[in-house]
Amino acid sequence: MNTLLHICCAPCANQCIDVLRGDHYEVTGFWYNPNIHPFTEYRARRNCLREYAATIELPLIERNDYGLRPFVRAVSQDIEHRCVKCYEFRLFEAARQAKEGGFDSFTSSLFISPYQNHELMREVAQRAAAEYDVEFLYRDFRPYFRAGQEKARELGFYIQKYCGCVFSEEERYLKKSKIVP
């Protein structure tokens, strides 16, 4: 079976790829992350993934839409519930790409993060699968998160400190500084 793996970053993807390949899936990576800002962050994550994909012979499809304006427009009406829009942006596009590319299924490296809302992501991915009539391959990759971070450090990957959106970055700094917005 061939599956399209939506990839948020190389540190999260490395163990997902290993697990899927270990389960005999033919994996193709898919880069689409209009939520990642600023542009320097977007570029750092994308370039790290490109280099890693080349070293492990991972086919990689890139949709390089730096989407600051569409992303902010989509989430600005309800900042507190922005994650659902972010998941929809990426998982619906992954499902569409999987269907159009003739893949048997799709999944995402987002499912490795203990910091993401797993049930919400799963629900969004299932809706995307139904809309595009393609299988959503669910895997709970969270048990591999620490090993993936270790491997990323060993390989010298760029490792980010926030999910990618500017609101997440703001939260990270506000927690450290104890400043109230």
What is each residue range found by the language model?
Residues 1-181:
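Nucleotide-activated chemistry modules centered on ATP-dependent adenylation/adenylyltransferase
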